[in-house]
Amino acid sequence: MSKHFFLHNEFHWQGRHDAEDGAAGSRVHHVVQQIDYTHIGENPYGVALLGFACDAGVARNKGRIGAKKSPDLIRRALANLAWHSPHPLYDLGTVVCDDDLLESSQQHCAKIIAEVLPCVPVITLGGGHEVAWASFSGLARYFEQHHPEKAPKIGIINFDAHFDLRAFSSSQADVKPSSGTPFNQIQHYCQQQGWDFHYACLGVSKASNTRALFERAEQLNVWFVEDKDLGSVNHDYHLTQLQHFIDDCDYLYLTIDLDVFPAATAPGVSAPAARGVSYDNLAPFLDRILAHRDKLMLADIAEYNPTYDVDSQTARLAARLCWDIANAMNDKLEHQ
């Protein structure tokens, strides 16, 4: 148990061991190090993993709960993947949100991210997509503490079937922060700080977002591409648009909601997609983002819900995405 009451670090990393291969047979479970986040400065190279076990945001958004169980199951799927980098992974544990204590849990998560980012990049494992507000809050704290002299140009790239731009405050009692509000919260924060709001949402479903949400996205100048338009026919055009978006930003925050994938690929989510975007169609966009690893500071994977998974296939998808991102972040370290 971590000495921090809100942070659990009890996962036991284990997996296949091929003794005959020696060091060349390394897998994630061989190289991951479980450490206290306050000691991260003693470990200057690598990538940090942080869990965010939370159902509160999805429950508030009237969704199917179960994502609270996901961080350790993603870790389990990640453990056996081969590891080729000379740099390790650091497991900082999991921030656990009990009951409806969403806001305090998000602040705990943000605090850890802000303290770790000066040393290593971070991948957060949700939890519902309320993790995005926690992640961005940590990134914002980092800039406020270490680079207060200049407003950062942060590009937020969200692979998601939903805009997650719902209202988070209202005179109506049931309107409050949830898994459906994080990017509206981020926009509000940026407006208060005088920061530009650079938000891209790729894979959005017209069937799953009301006209009010599309109007909100247009009002905020969100660059979005619908799920039906992310096919291979349109790759070159949209990849060019993505490159322009990246070029206009100094830093990148990548967030992946697993419900962007078809239900057949990712059944284990709160809101499975009838259409979605195939991994093959999404991969060129992810690869383009990861090619700009020098700008990528932070990423998270959200909305895995093991209650509805089939043969752990969504867990394996989440683990592979985490693996891809972590390898790109470690490649950045090798080229510094």
Swiss-Prot record:
How the cofactor binds, per note?
Binds 2 manganese ions per subunit.
HAMAP family given in the database record: Formimidoylglutam
**InterPro entries in the record, alphabetically?**
HutG (IPR005923), Ureohydrolase (IPR006035), Ureohydrolase_dom_sf (IPR023696), Ureohydrolase_Mn_BS (IPR020855)
Q: Which of UniProt's keywords are assigned here?
A: Histidine metabolism, Hydrolase, Manganese, Metal-binding
Known pathway: Amino-acid degradation; L-histidine degradation into L-glutamate; L-glutamate from N-formimidoyl-L-glutamate (hydrolase route): step 1/1
Write down the chemical reaction(s) this protein catalyses.
Answer: N-formimidoyl-L-glutamate + H2O = formamide + L-glutamate
Q: Which CDD domains match?
A: Formimidoylglutamase
- Residues binding Mn(2+) 1, per UniProt: H129, D160, D164, D257
Q: Which cofactor does it need?
A: Mn(2+)
The gene for this chain is hutG
Where on the tree of life does the source sit, at the highest rank?
A: Bacteria
Q: What class of enzyme is it?
A: hydrolase
What EC designation does it have? 3.5.3.8
**Record GO biological process:** L-histidine catabolic process to glutamate and formamide; L-histidine catabolic process to glutamate and formate; putrescine biosynthetic process from arginine, via agmatine
Q: Which PANTHER family match?
A: ARGINASE/AGMATINASE (PTHR11358), FORMIMIDOYLGLUTAMASE (PTHR11358:SF35)
Can you name this protein? Formimidoylglutamase
NCBIfam families assigned to the protein according to its UniProt record, in alphabetical order: hutG
- Where along this sequence does the record place binding of Mn(2+) 2? D160, H162, D257, D259
Report the sequence similarity comment from the record. Belongs to the arginase family.
Q: What does this protein do?
A: Catalyzes the conversion of N-formimidoyl-L-glutamate to L-glutamate and formamide.
**Which GO molecular function annotations are given, in alphabetical order?**
agmatinase activity; formimidoylglutamase activity; manganese ion binding
